[in-house]
């Protein structure tokens, strides 16, 4: 009987832990989590699913890439929705993607296009999520999960956590897992940051920063 009770308890933890893991604003992700190859919270078929700001911002891509540029499947959107996400952005590559809202038992997920060279919409959405403790996290993904999603994530770390551009670019470089960038990876990320400026209107409190930012 004791074994049966333990098995049921573990099953309940597994069933509920997914949502709790992605929505908890628990003091900022560890470096190892930010650079992990993937996470147990990743929807099936997605890769490099990593926290950026605890309970607020995650990043990812697709296993094998998204060569058709069709974006997340209905099942992936529903899985994100059920786990507590409120918003997802496809950065740069979603030309054949049908964006829109997905409803689920726990709420809804809005799926929209984004550009790593025009980050203001993503930053504003992340800010609104930080300010609303009841709002589920944002996922920003790209084709592979290394370049464009990483650039927007690095910008968010500068905007909300006070990171220097140098530190943020170093994070982007390490998190791309050696993926090529054409002629120069430094030139690629520099060009993205040339289009980014910290927005003073999106300032957050020290307490909010302590709850979500990596140390």
Question: How should these model regions be labeled?
Answer:
Residues 18-140, 144, 151-215:
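Cys-dependent protein tyrosine phosphatase-like superfamily
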Residues 5-13:
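Bacterial N-terminal signal peptides
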